[in-house]
Design a protein with these regions (language model features):
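Class I SAM-dependent methyltransferase SAM/SAH-binding core
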Residues: 1-31
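Hydrophobic beta-strand segment of the Class I
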Residues: 41-42
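A short glycine-rich, Lys/Arg-flanked "PGG" loop and its adjoining helix->strand segment in the class I
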Residues: 48-64
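Conserved class I S-adenosyl-L-methionine
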Residues: 62-94
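Conserved Class I S-adenosyl-L-methionine
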Residues: 106-170
Length: 170
């Protein structure tokens, strides 16, 4: 995914005419950049090391984190009685927030986003579930190894039936 995303970002950058922007793929837990290097670091759906990011940001630089919250896809997790952060006491967003504050960031906003996505077909929803860790049973609090379980057909069909709307399956 990352190489393709960078390719798309570079195409968009070319169209924008801006010259002071570059994109890189790297391990966010082993960043290979000097201190005070970035104006902006973004992280989406990933584990972050806020202390390392803090060191790589220029003075006045910004960090934007968009992560999966405990309540993301909650109705699905409830139906299957498992899933990413299902058993966690703290939501992932709060875990990240505390780590960011501990790293030295001063102006921090925690803005919960809860988006309802709709899928045209049950095949589309199923494809998402087998490619993402939504129903994988693991804890964001303890970072334990997660267990990939098969998606039970009967439970999946029940979910589809209960969550099909005129907009699609939510």
């Amino acid at each position: 995914f990352s190489d393709k995303m960078i390719e798309t970002a570079n195409k968009n950058l070319l169209q924008s005419g801006r010259r002071n922007i570059s994109f890189r793929v790297m391990d966010n837990l082993k960043m290979d950049t000097p201190d005070n290097y970035f104006d902006l670091v973004t992280a989406r759906h990933t584990i972050i090391d806020p202390l390392q990011i803090y060191k790589t940001l220029k003075e006045g630089g910004q960090l934007i984190v968009r992560g999966v919250d405990k309540l993301d896809c909650w109705s699905l997790k409830r139906m299957f009685k498992r899933g990413q952060a299902y058993h966690d006491v703290k939501p992932i967003s709060l875990i990240d927030y505390e780590a960011i504050m501990d790293a030295g960031f001063k102006e921090v906003e925690l803005i919960p986003l809860h988006v309802i996505e709709y899928y045209k077909t049950k095949e589309d929803l199923y494809a998402l579930l087998v490619k993402t860790p939504i129903l994988d049973d693991f804890s964001e609090e303890s970072f334990n190894e997660y267990e990939r379980k098969p998606i039970e057909k009967k439970t999946f069909e029940k979910y589809v039936k209960q969550n099909t709307t005129e907009k699609g399956i939510k």
